[in-house]
């Protein structure tokens, strides 16, 4: 029972993602997110944090994978709620307009 629900969820996510790609909405959402994150200073905050980590550990001792692993949780936490809410609203509107999924 649990497996079939997970499978249905995965199928639904795949169908939604496919529709987002086909309509070009996925790219528009990514552009909106990129602009909003720059606008609120998120990109600069993360860049500064990356520099701190590299300075702490030394350039020779940090791989890109290390940096990503260290930065990702902070990056997610720093996304303002207003940006999350706006993106979620855009996705909900899109889904309402394409309810045939």
UniProtKB/Swiss-Prot annotation:
GO molecular-function terms, A-Z: chromatin binding; transcription coactivator activity
Family, per entry: Belongs to the ENY2 family.
Protein name: Transcription and mRNA export factor ENY2
Function, as annotated: Involved in mRNA export coupled transcription activation by association with both the TREX-2 and the SAGA complexes. The transcription regulatory histone acetylation (HAT) complex SAGA is a multiprotein complex that activates transcription by remodeling chromatin and mediating histone acetylation and deubiquitination. Within the SAGA complex, participates in a subcomplex that specifically deubiquitinates both histones H2A and H2B. The SAGA complex is recruited to specific gene promoters by activators such as MYC, where it is required for transcription.
Quaternary structure note: Component of the nuclear pore complex (NPC)-associated TREX-2 complex (transcription and export complex 2), composed of at least ENY2, the isoform GANP of the MCM3AP gene, PCID2, SEM1, and either centrin CETN2 or CETN3. TREX-2 contains 2 ENY2 chains. The TREX-2 complex also associates with ALYREF/ALY and with the nucleoporin NUP153. Component of some SAGA transcription coactivator-HAT complexes, at least composed of ATXN7, ATXN7L3, ENY2, GCN5L2, SUPT3H/SPT3, TAF10, TRRAP and USP22.
Cross-link annotation Glycyl lysine isopeptide (Lys-Gly) (interchain with G-Cter in SUMO2), location: 74
Localization, UniProt: Nucleus, Nucleoplasm
Taxonomic lineage from the root: Eukaryota, Metazoa, Chordata, Craniata, Vertebrata
Predominant location category: nucleus
Keyword annotations: Acetylation, Activator, Chromatin regulator, Isopeptide bond, mRNA transport, Nucleus, Protein transport, Transcription, Transcription regulation, Translocation, Transport, Ubl conjugation
BP terms from Gene Ontology: chromatin organization; negative regulation of insulin secretion involved in cellular response to glucose stimulus; poly(A)+ mRNA export from nucleus; positive regulation of DNA-templated transcription; protein transport; regulation of DNA repair; regulation of RNA splicing; regulation of transcription by RNA polymerase II
Gene Ontology CC: DUBm complex; mitochondrion; nuclear pore nuclear basket; nucleoplasm; SAGA complex; transcription export complex 2; transcription factor TFTC complex
HAMAP family: ENY2_Sus1 (MF_03046)
InterPro entries cross-referenced by the UniProt entry: TF_ENY2, TF_EnY2_sf
């Amino acid at each position: 029972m649990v497996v079939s629900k997970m499978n249905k969820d995965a199928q639904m996510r795949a169908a939604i993602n496919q529709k987002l790609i086909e309509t070009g909405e996925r790219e528009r959402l990514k552009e909106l997110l990129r602009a909003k994150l720059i606008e609120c200073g998120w990109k600069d905050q993360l860049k500064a944090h990356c520099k701190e980590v590299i300075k702490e550990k030394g350039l020779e001792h940090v791989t890109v994978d290390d940096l990503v692993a260290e930065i990702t949780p902070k990056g997610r936490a720093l996304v303002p709620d207003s940006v999350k809410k706006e993106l979620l609203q855009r996705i909900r509107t899109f889904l309402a307009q394409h309810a045939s999924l």
